Amino acid sequence: MHVPQAEQLGQAITSLRPRQIGAIPLVYPILADLGVRQITNDLVPTEADIDMGRIVLLLTLNRLLAPQPLYHVQDWLAETVLPQVLDIAPEKAYDNRLGRALDRLYPHLGELWARLASQAIQVYDLDLNVLHWDITSIYFEGAYTDSELAAYGYSRDHRPDTKQVNLEVDVTHDGYVPILYHTLPGNTADITRPLPHLSRPRC
């Protein structure tokens, strides 16, 4: 862990107010090594009091450690050491603000992922000679009538009553770090993907 990160976490932990620490000291340094905040801010600059990089860090940590809807992130944040670590007051992390941030981030997701993957390859000296590929699915509650991706299909979650989106992922052999991903309509058959997918890692 870098010294500034350790000092930030240490100051938060010594607070007299009880707060959740959990796996933050393990996960936060990895996000810092990957340069999540700086890469995000380079792609989506803002003059707001909370930069996009910190919002992405907050939402990433929430998704990894305690996944919940946007309207609960504010309450979760208040119970953790992250207000001190990220310098984000809980009252400023309301759901509409987080939603607008995600809308701004969406057009840049491909470039953001590419830069983060490149950073991970360099920082952790990942071996790309062998990649493992697989398809999974994520199901959604609701109609999603205007979605081009959400569709009924083979449900790996045993939820044939819900629409889903398929996700194909390539991970490294050493550590199973995700390097490439591609979203697919939920009714895509696995058997149709190997040949088209072979061209993607070479691009």
Give a label for each model feature.
Residues M1-A151, D161, E168-N187, L195:
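Dynamic "connector" segments at or just before major functional cores
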Residues I191-C203:
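Short, basic/hydrophobic alpha-helical segments
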